[in-house]
Curated annotation (Swiss-Prot):
The gene is PRDM10. Keywords: Activator, Disease variant, DNA-binding, Isopeptide bond, Metal-binding, Nucleus, Phosphoprotein, Repeat, Transcription, Transcription regulation, Ubl conjugation, Zinc, Zinc-finger. This is PR domain zinc finger protein 10. Residues 227-331 are annotated as: N-terminal PR domain. Residues 1118-1140 have a biased composition (Low complexity). One of its GO terms (biological process) is positive regulation of transcription by RNA polymerase II. Residues 133-162 have a biased composition (Acidic residues). Residues 901-1127 are annotated as: C-terminal glutamine-rich region. It is linked to Birt-Hogg-Dube syndrome 2: A form of Birt-Hogg-Dube syndrome, a rare genodermatosis usually manifesting in adulthood and characterized by multiple fibrofolliculomas, trichodiscomas, and acrochordons. Patients with this syndrome have an increased susceptibility to develop renal cell carcinoma, lung cysts, and spontaneous pneumothorax. BHD2 inheritance is autosomal dominant. It comes from Homo sapiens (Human). The SET domain is degenerated, suggesting that it has lost methyltransferase activity. The modification Phosphothreonine is found at residue 428. The keyword Metal-binding applies.
Amino acid sequence: MDSKDESSHVWPTSAEHEQNAAQVHFVPDTGTVAQIVYTDDQVRPPQQVVYTADGASYTSVDGPEHTLVYIHPVEAAQTLFTDPGQVAYVQQDATAQQASLPVHNQVLPSIESVDGSDPLATLQTPLGRLEAKEEEDEDEDEDTEEDEEEDGEDTDLDDWEPDPPRPFDPHDLWCEECNNAHASVCPKHGPLHPIPNRPVLTRARASLPLVLYIDRFLGGVFSKRRIPKRTQFGPVEGPLVRGSELKDCYIHLKVSLDKGDRKERDLHEDLWFELSDETLCNWMMFVRPAQNHLEQNLVAYQYGHHVYYTTIKNVEPKQELKVWYAASYAEFVNQKIHDISEEERKVLREQEKNWPCYECNRRFISSEQLQQHLNSHDEKLDVFSRTRGRGRGRGKRRFGPGRRPGRPPKFIRLEITSENGEKSDDGTQDLLHFPTKEQFDEAEPATLNGLDQPEQTTIPIPQLPQETQSSLEHEPETHTLHLQPQHEESVVPTQSTLTADDMRRAKRIRLELQNAALQHLFIRKSFRPFKCLQCGKAFREKDKLDQHLRFHGREGNCPLTCDLCNKGFISSTSLESHMKLHSDQKTYSCIFCPESFDRLDLLKDHVAIHINDGYFTCPTCKKRFPDFIQVKKHVRSFHSEKIYQCTECDKAFCRPDKLRLHMLRHSDRKDFLCSTCGKQFKRKDKLREHMQRMHNPEREAKKADRISRSKTFKPRITSTDYDSFTFKCRLCMMGFRRRGMLVNHLSKRHPDMKIEEVPELTLPIIKPNRDYFCQYCDKVYKSASKRKAHILKNHPGAELPPSIRKLRPAGPGEPDPMLSTHTQLTGTIATPPVCCPHCSKQYSSKTKMVQHIRKKHPEFAQLSNTIHTPLTTAVISATPAVLTTDSATGETVVTTDLLTQAMTELSQTLTTDYRTPQGDYQRIQYIPVSQSASGLQQPQHIQLQVVQVASATSPHQSQQSTVDVGQLHDPQPYPQHAIQVQHIQVSGQPLSPSAQQAQQGLSPSHIQGSSSTQGQALQQQQQQQQNSSVQHTYLPSAWNSFRGYSSEIQMMTLPPGQFVITDSGVATPVTTGQVKAVTSGHYVLSESQSELEEKQTSALSGGVQVEPPAHSDSLDPQTNSQQQTTQYIITTTTNGNGSSEVHITKP
């Protein structure tokens, strides 16, 4: 594959541009931005090419067309390569001269003026023509637009006449177009487009912590969540004034000053916080003082030079913070602390009881007291729950019908009659326990669940302890318990043997429990210390009393008044409930008949007449239900009129809550996240359904035990369509449209194939670079997700822009749907593919690769040394090989150029993240090309080098980029070097590869670098074998993706393992007549080799002999103990004296 075809996949070009010329302008300020302006007849926007200083990215602004900048030295001028067929030479003074020459990806001859004049002078003419032509076109367009605007204005406002100039008046609105002021809106140019300022909170409101909020109507600071005891707030901030300068505020706080502070301020008294200005104080000015010790939950005190508030009890959510002074601080401010009354002490004691008893609703301070109390329940009677009909289908109710959590249990009467029908002396029994709802009994199918029944309800049957039942077996006199149900046919007689002593004992226990519960309820419910003197109504909080006094009475004081009876109300909800009494509309309708009622209790009494054989019958489908709640729910769900219509689709619902739930389908918000797989859902029930279906234990176990079966491979395309695809598998003769499809194919079918063997997968990924604008403000983001988060946070309720992936193509006459996305294409970015070190998968970002490793290779995710850090070095080959001739002067062979250098840095950046890890051996083939007037010549020598990738400790730290701004103007200072052969000798390392050595490879501490020159032999130095390292051996991977340029670089990775490298050099000439002497070395690489080969050849010209290295004898003891395997022999040939070295620079 030649370079033109390969680059066209990355940089798409058009065939019609082959003969077009272009002018290039370099921006003098930066030196890294080049603007390409085409000079042909076609009208095309200019292209701006950015080549960053660190070589990290490439950007083209013109959209679908791409332009890549290559810089090449040609005798004091740089060549800029754009699309094929467009070449411009950039001179040292940042000016350009156009040229229409075909590009063969080789070194081009320098520009010479035909008449011998300065080439810079010929440049100014086309540039001047182009600029003049552009100015003329702009002037014509402006004149045309101005004429059209004037014609439109004349037709719209023919009768308008300008007003005479008005004197300055602050109430007039200035119009710049009219150069005059107007009383209101300008009659010609219309109103202005105002953009208001953002509202800025005061300092006091802006400093409010996130766990607190200020009530907008009542004032005061309230808690959003539970705040534990001993939580400190503060310090209080505000101006300090004297006591005589204090203004009205919630609480007065005094600050004690030291003697030094008083002398500085020239004061003779302490200062007070003035907490009345929101712009000077913080949020603590809104905390109101407590009126008694019961409502106090904060204490104020001074610590150092500041005043703090600390919670003295747990603050519950939606509870107001109330503060008062500490004991010592109260004396300092001449205030008294709140005294605790006996009733308040009882309430506080009850609040401190955090250990509840679930048998009798009592609470205790410690777990020991609760355990002692639970022991007393062993002697009490247990009550069986009576059986009832099925409920609403949501499981068993915990607190019985009609009782909400937190409400006291109901008292149920139990009548006990003897066998002869007479009532016993015990009369009625009060039970604190209320039964739980169970299944309906067959004898009692229908109940008015949820309705108030006028008759006495069915009574549960008590059960005595086992010891009591055993004692009753010897008693002759027994009693029979009879229930008093609502209907006589549903009486359930239950026989139980109870003596009179047992019944009296049970009654005494129940009375004790009842008295304890009543006392507990009195303390919590009936303590109302704040009473209204006008009507006698009492409240538990002073704020409630103040609110009641503010709207006391019926005339004039209440904000809301009934128009019919002049009754006053303090809330709209109370007024709406009251207005139902004056309306003729019956709110509560019976589902079985046309009757309607204005009160719910009347409806509850009415529906009992519709019971037929113990069941309620649906009036529409004749389905029977044993419970009224069930039939009511059935009618409302299936037979109600669907009056709530969805505005997005054709669905309708009978209830507004169902419509709100359905509207989540049309929204973009997904607030429910699956913690297992990360999938998001709009509704909680869908998340629950996903968890049950996808992440249940049975499915996970079946998925883990599933055996992967290989499917038979069937090619999907014919061989004729194979060449039309960009990404191809050459083993299967199969083509793919996208890179990811080829990667997935290789991972499944060819897992042993390496990425370096597939040229298509080494190409960079071209991704569009977009700006995402917020249509509600001036924010710009680089991703749609960040813009979406910004809109949801700062513009709640605003409509989100549509996603680019969900846009449908515009029809005829329709606007471009991309206009509604509020995005703009700013160019493209070439990013390197990031390869997984454990499989053939590759991704566009390192983040996705890390996620892949955590999911597919969890055993490697925990090992920090598995993921190798990419090398930060590159080989910049920039020294020419000097061909030594018989004459004194040497002819320089141009072995590299700035084009290759720029491509080196670009590929260095593109291949940073998937470079070969340490321990792999690579071969680099370097083919230099010489420059002459007759054109290109054949390569004069070839160098091969085998190196190991390792870190370097270079004494000279180079700059970040080797393509500098100054080199664009003057390429001469940049040195050029040729690759120097590095002969590597091995220290005393055992040749038998172990399992650990096979993983680590040849360590840099076991090899030593040296240079081979003419007439020298490699000598072993035993004292330098330890702690030695190899430098100048850094090579980037995947150079085969940039073939066909003037300097071709190819890579080959040898199989991993423990290798032994030896050298034996001979002097062999390559050509005759020009080369005086050439050094040739043979590298023998063997895996687990027992004996090192030594090869010596005689020089064909010059008779120079290079002796074998001396370190081979030290490795002889292990000759007979190892088994010889495959060998890799690579010949290295060097022209010249071999004195130059490879320069290693960091990008």
